């Protein structure tokens, strides 16, 4: 089965072709970072218009690279939500039009399910069941995953997502857009320089006794330091390091607590913050002490991409999704809880 995946939930236009026997045949991604950098954040209307410009050329590109034609296509999967409504509509419209013209199934995929399943594209891949840490600019959640579509929410952020906190802290430090990766680079450079840590920031909700997160207080603590100190390169680096260490410690310890609570030994980390080197290092080190294994997507699949949508669509269709009432529906869900998707995809 050959599946075309389309991802347009925010500021990346991603497409991919996944074959259930041959694996990932081709994929392409266009990032709008440079365009939105001028405004310091994503402008929804500009994002939608750029998806319109980029999507069809990218689709033609991956078909040419894979050496297949539209007639070879068996199904289309697109990001149904959550995300920016206008951006989602672009991908949904193209998917629906192609599906109608080619007479192939069209399936809407939950964006977070795509991220959650993306480590299964790697080798070695995790097997169900596992705990998933979904950590990105819009979401921070711990899920117990017992099978495809079987997701139980263990905990989530009560305010800012981790990636959002990275971006906002970077802005306070005067770093460029996107701020999260810039902050991580600065923190890593400060650590490698051998300078001693100057600041200790709070670890919000570290000992709350549940699996929820909070990052707004951490951001406020950074603001206090910024207002108190002259922003020399050394001070800026020290604050970045202190912030990253605090955020990473909370993410690490909550994830290990979730493994202990569920009795599972596999942790899947997905989403843009999953590319953070210190987070990966800490998780690997701490998981090793309890006999657990951590799985990550390839770095190129940590951010939004079409490969994860094509793969999730293929898994859904192979599991019998073709009998689903939501197949062929032209819908988007800008706000959509992953845990609720089996109860109501159109909620």
Curated annotation (Swiss-Prot):
Keyword RNA-binding included in the entry's annotation: no
Signal peptide: none
Enzyme superclass (EC): transferase
GO cellular component term, pick one: cytoplasm
Subcellular localization, as worded in the UniProt entry: Cytoplasm
InterPro entries attached to this UniProt entry: ATPase_NBD, Gcp-like_dom, KAE1/TsaD, TsaD
Domain of life: Bacteria
EC numbers on record: 2.3.1.234
CDD domains: ASKHA_NBD_TsaD_bac
Any one GO biological process: tRNA threonylcarbamoyladenosine modification
Binding site for substrate: 134-138, 167, 180, 276
Cofactor note: Binds 1 Fe(2+) ion per subunit.
Annotated GO MF terms: iron ion binding; N(6)-L-threonylcarbamoyladenine synthase activity
Keyword entries, A-Z: Acyltransferase, Cytoplasm, Iron, Metal-binding, Transferase, tRNA processing
Catalytic activity reported: L-threonylcarbamoyladenylate + adenosine(37) in tRNA = N(6)-L-threonylcarbamoyladenosine(37) in tRNA + AMP + H(+)
Needed cofactors: Fe(2+)
Chain residues that bind Fe cation: 111, 115, 304
Record function comment: Required for the formation of a threonylcarbamoyl group on adenosine at position 37 (t(6)A37) in tRNAs that read codons beginning with adenine. Is involved in the transfer of the threonylcarbamoyl moiety of threonylcarbamoyl-AMP (TC-AMP) to the N6 group of A37, together with TsaE and TsaB. TsaD likely plays a direct catalytic role in this reaction.
Family: Belongs to the KAE1 / TsaD family.
Protein's name according to its UniProt entry: tRNA N6-adenosine threonylcarbamoyltransferase
Organism classification: Bacteria, Pseudomonadati, Pseudomonadota, Betaproteobacteria, Nitrosomonadales
This protein's encoding gene: tsaD
